[in-house]
Amino acid sequence: TALLGPEPLDLTEIEGADVLYHAEGIIRESEANAAALFGTKKTVYSAEGSSLCIRAMLYLALLHARANHKKPVIAAGRNAHKVFMTAAALLDLDIRWIYGTESVISCAITPAQLEDVIVSENPAAVYITSPDYLGNIADIKSLSTVCKKHDVLLLVDNAHGAYLHFLPEPMHPMQLGADICCDSAHKTLPVLTGGAYLHIAHGTPDMFAQRAESAMALFASTSPSYLILQSLDAMNPLLATSFPAQLKACAERLDTLKAMLRAHGYAL
């Protein structure tokens, strides 16, 4: 007797159902579809949220640092999620905090400020949270330019911005120069809780795409939820068809609402 209802869909890694972090069949095909939609070199699914993706991002940054004889130092905005700190502790990474020019919560980091930090600290990577917890979006394009100038990786916690790629203007970290980012699909897309993406950008060293799955597997459960994976897969045709238009219409309604609020004296 089904207790919740979806039990018939609650598969596990059996023959024909593929293996999430050694994907060769249906999961690999679905992830390739997602990569095409997000314009990435590689996209890997997570059934354990962006928390898992953040650990994998830092592990890949550590491998890159070792390969390039750099110290295991990450420069990070001080508003980073707690999983960033626990992952850094687990991997024995040193953190150099970057404090925002306005507040710790918004942690607005300027390109000039980032340049100073990179020159003084020589980090292996820079870690930015954007959008932040108030909805503010960092100037990823300008920060990326600074990172590329100094050959430093740019990692972005885009947990609250999976939808950004599907707006009319380029706003997603993968469109603006980030090297690796994570999206919590379950936060801003109709995906079950825990569904997330690890994205690897075009132009990054091949090692990142080659090691992405093993980096995820290092921290992940060997029993991923196939219900979550199916919801990620079901999202692909929606992203490819009606979602961008729906998102555009929603953004237009929000613009109208903001104009009304400003007209009534509210500061936004």
Label each PLM-derived region with a short phrase:
Residues L37, T43, E48-A267:
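Conserved PLP-enzyme active-site core in the AAT-like
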Residues T1-P6:
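N-terminal glycine-rich, Lys/His-bearing helix-loop that initiates the first secondary-structure elements
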Residues E7-L52:
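Conserved N-terminal alpha-helix of the aminotransferase class I/II PLP-enzyme fold
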